[in-house]
Every structure is written in structure tokens, then in C-alpha cells.
Regions:
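Sec-dependent bacterial lipoprotein signal peptides
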Residues: 1-16
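Short, compositionally biased low-complexity segments
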Residues: 3, 37-42
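Short, low-complexity N-terminal intrinsically disordered segments enriched in polar/charged residues
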Residues: 16-39
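Short solvent-exposed beta->alpha transition segments
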Residues: 27-28, 43-93
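N-terminal non-globular leader segments, chiefly Sec-dependent signal peptides
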Residues: 34-38, 47-53, 96, 100-104
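Exposed beta-sheet edge and beta->alpha loop/turn motif
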Residues: 83-128
């Protein structure tokens, strides 16, 4: 009986020490990136995209302009995005990728579910 309790205690300690599951970490990262977009921090949103090489400055500026245009379009069509919620996430730890399902709650009371593909690089989750 004592051995069983010892093994159970080891299992609980190991599971607690491992941290949150990768799908939860990817989901939180995706939400943070979209929260930055909604807060008008377009450069930080763009920095959330995975780029194995450095981006030319002109291309990065285009991505920032596109992000601003997207927010403006959502404002025109739906009175803006009020909130971003995490619905679900599925991670493939062998391939270091995840699909995060988010819901946009719009100002006109409609919602839309989107899928954000994510990739993990050196312990950081980025949007693809």
C-alpha cells in the first residue's frame, strides 16, 4: 500500500511540474496576439507571425497596414470586434504545431469562429 501511495505521489508531482499542456499555451498565445491587434498594437501583432528569416522592413510595414485595414473593415461591417474568446485548441507536439479555435464577438452581437494555425519555435508559439 505504501508503494502504491509513493508511486501515486510521484505521478501527481510529475504531472504538476510539467506545466500547462501545449494546446493551452498555444491558445493563450493566439489570444494575446489578437488582443494586441484589437488594442491597436499592430506591430506587436505582426511580430506574432512565424518568420524563419527576418522580414524586409517594407514587407513588415505592409503587414502592419493590412492589420489596420482588417480592424477598420471589422469596424465598418460589424461595429468592431468587442472580444476574442478561446473555444478550443489541438496541438501536435511531435510536429510542434497547433490549431487554435477562437471566437470573435462583434459589436453588432454576431460572432464568428476562426482557426489560427500556430507553430512552436524554441518554446514560443507563433501564428503561421
Amino acid at each position: 500500500m505504501r508503494k502504491l501511495l509513493y508511486v501515486a505521489a510521484l505521478f501527481v508531482a510529475a504531472s504538476c511540474a510539467s506545466g500547462p499542456p501545449p494546446d493551452e499555451v498555444a491558445a493563450q498565445a493566439a489570444k494575446v496576439y489578437y488582443d494586441q491587434l484589437l488594442a491597436g498594437k499592430y506591430d506587436q501583432y505582426v511580430d506574432g507571425f512565424y518568420c524563419p528569416d527576418s522580414l524586409p522592413n517594407s514587407y513588415r510595414e505592409q503587414l502592419i497596414v493590412n492589420a489596420k485595414m482588417f480592424v477598420g473593415q471589422q469596424q465598418d461591417e460589424h461595429r468592431g470586434i468587442r472580444e476574442v474568446r478561446i473555444v478550443n485548441a489541438k496541438a501536435d507536439t511531435a510536429r510542434h504545431v497547433a490549431d487554435v479555435f477562437l471566437v470573435f464577438a462583434y459589436g453588432d452581437s454576431t460572432t464568428e469562429q476562426i482557426v489560427v494555425p500556430m507553430v512552436e519555435q524554441e518554446g514560443v508559439w507563433y501564428m503561421r
